[in-house]
Amino acid sequence: MQLAVPVRQVRVTVLSTDGIWSTGSLFLKPVAASHAGPETVLDRLNDQEMFLPVQLPGERSITLLHKAHIVRLVVQDAQPGDALTEDQENLSGRIEPVHCTVVPGQQLSGWLSVQAPEWKARLSDYVNTLPGSFFPLYADDALHLINKHAVLRIQSQG
């Protein structure tokens, strides 16, 4: 008898610190460990595991990507709840337009949803107190999940 945990498959594209892009599938659990509802890509990036398991196209085996060497991850054809929880997708906070430069010098423009009280709503306060290593950067083309350790600079455009 084979026992298996049901999972959701999500297509992702990952940029690593060596400048290589990888496209593959990430498998998410139906129930998250840290909140109500299904596990999200951001949950997987910010959990305590050192490696992110991804299945590359045409391969049966899983490739393990060291999270410390992931610069950013883009969710392909995202459905609501795939990348972020519904609370995180609700852009109810202050929208902060930013220009972000990440290793190896790539530049992104987008915005952050600053979910913070007025007294702690400066960009520096918000970025420095984000939980986990990864945070969402909303852009016109996609949602980018950025590794804070790979950010060279963030500039407010507001």
Could you tell me what each predicted segment is?
Residues 1-158:
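Conserved RNA-binding domains used in RNP assembly and mRNA/RNA metabolism
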